[in-house]
């Protein structure tokens, strides 16, 4: 490669790296550090109250059971979106659900730095029949995953409305994660 071409390539790479926010670079490199930067402290999750396990590892994938929004006091948010919760409150519930999933994932792996990427998410929203902004609700979760894992937090996703969810929680999300080799 000619010297001029190498210089052009290096300049372009520098521009690309400078255009990526520092927080996204940190997130991709070290999600554990990124959680600290965000002020998020993961707790040890309570054991399931039904006959299932929170996570199953198969090869380099981890399948996480559905989780709901747990408030700071340890209680679930309860109610229907469009009745007890506004869109913004429901997005916050989805974010809290993301924290619950990260707690379950860390309990399974011991270290979130083992995560290569978030692969697939199913977001379920307990909403009144006329509510149709399910995808916007689940953005509360998806935004958190990108904040924590950078571009590796972007994922395939379905967001659906439900007539009810266990314990009358407003949001339940399940997730599939790929691990580093």
Please provide the spans of the model-predicted regions.
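Short, polar/acidic, helix-capping and beta-turn segments at strand->helix junctions
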Residues: 24-181
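Bacterial N-terminal signal peptides that target proteins for export
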Residues: 1-11
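Short, intrinsically disordered, low-complexity terminal segments
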Residues: 5, 19-24
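Bacterial N-terminal signal peptides
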Residues: 9-19
């Amino acid at each position: 490669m000619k010297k001029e071409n190498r210089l052009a390539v290096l300049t372009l790479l520098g521009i690309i790296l400078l255009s990526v926010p520092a927080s996204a670079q940190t997130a991709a490199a070290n999600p554990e550090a990124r959680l600290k930067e965000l002020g998020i402290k993961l707790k040890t999750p309570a054991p399931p109250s039904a006959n299932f396990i929170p996570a199953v590892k198969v090869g380099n994938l981890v399948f996480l059971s559905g989780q709901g929004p747990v408030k700071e006091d340890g209680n679930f948010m309860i109610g229907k979106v469009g009745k007890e919760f506004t869109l913004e409150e429901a997005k916050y519930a989805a974010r809290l659900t993301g924290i619950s999933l990260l707690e379950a994932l860390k309990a399974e792996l011991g270290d979130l730095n083992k995560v290569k990427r978030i692969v697939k998410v199913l977001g379920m929203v307990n909403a009144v029949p006329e509510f149709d902004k399910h995808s916007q609700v689940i953005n509360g979760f998806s935004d958190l995953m990108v904040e924590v894992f950078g571009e590796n937090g972007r994922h395939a996703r379905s967001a659906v409305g439900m007539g009810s969810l266990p314990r009358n929680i407003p949001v339940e999300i399940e997730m599939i994660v790929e691990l580093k080799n």
